Structure formats: C-alpha cells, structure tokens
Amino acid sequence: MAVGDKIVGGADLHALVDTLDDVKPDAPFSVYEDIRDKLIAGGVPAHEIAFIHDANTDARKKELFSKVRRGQVRVLMGSTFKMGAGMNVQDRLIALHDLDCPWRPGDLEQRKGRIVRQGNQNQEVHIYRYVTEGTFDSYLWQTVENKQKFISQIMTSKSPVRS
C-alpha cells in the first residue's frame, strides 16, 4: 500500500511542517489551504485535516492532540515552531513532509523527532523533503547538511582534517 493510499483509507497520521510561523487567512495564497483542498479533492474528509495554528489555546491543543492520537485527525499541518517540543502525537505518524528547509539543523532534528520516536505504532515511517532543483532550496538543503556535519564533528571530536 502506498503512503498516499494510507491518507485516503487508513488511520495513520501525516504531518506537514514548514518554517512559517502563522497561517494568514487574509493572504491571497496559503500553501496549507491549497494542500488541504487537494487532499479533500483526493478523498480525504475535511474533518480529518487540521492546522496546528487553529489550536490557539491549551484546551484546543489538548483536544486536537487527542483527536490525532485517536486517528480522528489524520493530516496535521503546521510550522516547526508550533509542532516542535511538547507535541506528543507520534502514536500513528506514518509520514513527515518537510515543505521547506529550516536554517538550523536542530530544527530538522526537532521535526524528525516528532515521528521517529518510541510509542509510534508504525515500524516504518517516511520522511519526504520537497526541493526544486536549481533553486535556493537546493543550496539551503546543502548548507544545512554542511552545518550538521560540522556540528557533528565538533560534538564527536572527529575531524576529517589532521592536526
């Protein structure tokens, strides 16, 4: 079964994240709304798609996270900031979709930490990164990868250069 099939038929959760801090309902174009509309057109019921930004109180977050853990919400979209630390909805996560590249390698780890963690019912998960070749996206992903390598070398005291 393909991951796309799981969106339409299963109770597994897809998390879509980017570095945008807020959904702007007045904006002429919203990537979140565009993705939501395409998911609905593809057969995902609208009530199974949620934006983390709509959970703007602790009570609403608690309610949303409960729905996600029960499989009532199967597509959750939001920013790295809003879907980072403190979001424990890993129970049914099957896929993480990185819509953009953050500047800091730690933000990528934070995203990955939402899905690759103890308590997830899925033994196999998928992480998708969307990059347009020949654009700043490609350069940014390469830059973040190089930053991560540098940080790892410092943390492990393993340097590729002899001293």
Residue ranges and their predicted role:
Residues 1-20, 147-163:
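Interdomain linker/hinge connecting the two RecA-like lobes of the SF2 helicase core
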Residues 19-22, 79-82, 133:
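A short beta-strand-to-loop transition that corresponds to the Sensor-1 phosphate-sensing loop
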Residues 50, 97, 128-130:
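Hydrophobic/aromatic beta-strand patches that form the interior of the parallel beta-sheet core
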Residues 63-64, 90, 138-143:
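Short aromatic-enriched loop/helix-cap "lid" or pocket-rim segments at secondary-structure transitions
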